[in-house]
């Protein structure tokens, strides 16, 4: 005979953590999760700050530029601009010594840029944690979150680590389309970025991933099992079928004939499709960290010396070096007004059209 002592309840008493856990992760249709406590507020503030800045806030006091819809910019030319170089690496808190609680002054000083950059970084981290949390909840492997580390690495290296290595937030990209293009030209002129091997690996990763994606999608479409009499993909197979929807064997034979080699199992194929772009993004991020420290790569000095001595000797490299000098000369004076740079007209390189 068994005697049970104690109070019997249908459900064990829940402590505060369990109540919160249920509220965040189970009692709703759209998953929030503990990661959502970081993701949603930070994403809201980052996007809200960007929309506010591009709509109303000028860059006259930091860059001498118009940068808002209010001043006549459009979607491509509006931006949330970086603070002035004189503010160095200040966090530019609204209540800090620079703005002293004055919201208008805070916007004029570029406070919205640090606001958007830092909240944006934590929002991206929150999104990666969301993928970890949801994967763990449904017992998936965490490769989605691992893959998303690539974009996070690029964002953090470009918007945070690079300016931290330079003299201030001023040299980070402003948050806008044309502003990012200007930053790319700046990277080329001042760092010769396109000849950096880490940039090359990044390009290979991103373009290689696009190629793999196109090949994979086309191959699956080409080798679908036909389950109906429909004329196109969306009618010729049943979306709820339990069986495999395409023939890996047929795909393998096809690419073996095309290239001579082909993936023989899906796990290796899909891991490769994960590995290529993520590795490319991480390599780019490492390269930008190097630029933050002003490391140089691939300076072919022997060609530069020979080109200087022999007017008839020229390579694509020496032409690009001259182009970079032109970018620096034209950009520096207008891009860094705080330096008060003045170049004599005769030293500014000009094309035939000018």
Swiss-Prot record:
NCBIfam families: psbD (TIGR01152). PSII is composed of 1 copy each of membrane proteins PsbA, PsbB, PsbC, PsbD, PsbE, PsbF, PsbH, PsbI, PsbJ, PsbK, PsbL, PsbM, PsbT, PsbX, PsbY, PsbZ, Psb30/Ycf12, at least 3 peripheral proteins of the oxygen-evolving complex and a large number of cofactors. It forms dimeric complexes. The D1/D2 heterodimer binds P680, chlorophylls that are the primary electron donor of PSII, and subsequent electron acceptors. It shares a non-heme iron and each subunit binds pheophytin, quinone, additional chlorophylls, carotenoids and lipids. There is also a Cl(-1) ion associated with D1 and D2, which is required for oxygen evolution. The PSII complex binds additional chlorophylls, carotenoids and specific lipids. It is an enzyme of class 1 (oxidoreductase). Keywords: Acetylation, Chlorophyll, Chloroplast, Chromophore, Electron transport, Iron, Magnesium, Membrane, Metal-binding, Oxidoreductase, Phosphoprotein, Photosynthesis, Photosystem II, Plastid, Thylakoid, Transmembrane, Transmembrane helix, Transport. It is a multi-pass membrane protein. This is Photosystem II D2 protein. One of its GO terms (molecular function) is electron transporter, transferring electrons within the cyclic electron transport pathway of photosynthesis activity. It holds the Pfam family Photo_RC. CDD domains: Photosystem-II_D2. The modification Phosphothreonine is found at residue 2. Photosystem II (PSII) is a light-driven water:plastoquinone oxidoreductase that uses light energy to abstract electrons from H(2)O, generating O(2) and a proton gradient subsequently used for ATP formation. It consists of a core antenna complex that captures photons, and an electron transfer chain that converts photonic excitation into a charge separation. The D1/D2 (PsbA/PsbD) reaction center heterodimer binds P680, the primary electron donor of PSII as well as several subsequent electron acceptors. D2 is needed for assembly of a stable PSII complex. The lineage of its organism: Eukaryota, Viridiplantae, Streptophyta, Embryophyta, Tracheophyta. It catalyses: 2 a plastoquinone + 4 hnu + 2 H2O = 2 a plastoquinol + O2. The chain crosses the membrane at residues 42-62, 126-142, 154-167, 209-229, 280-296. Its main location: plastid. Pheophytin a binds at residues 131, 144. Chlorophyll a ChlzD2 binds at residue 119. A plastoquinone binds at residues 216, 263. It comes from Piper cenocladum.
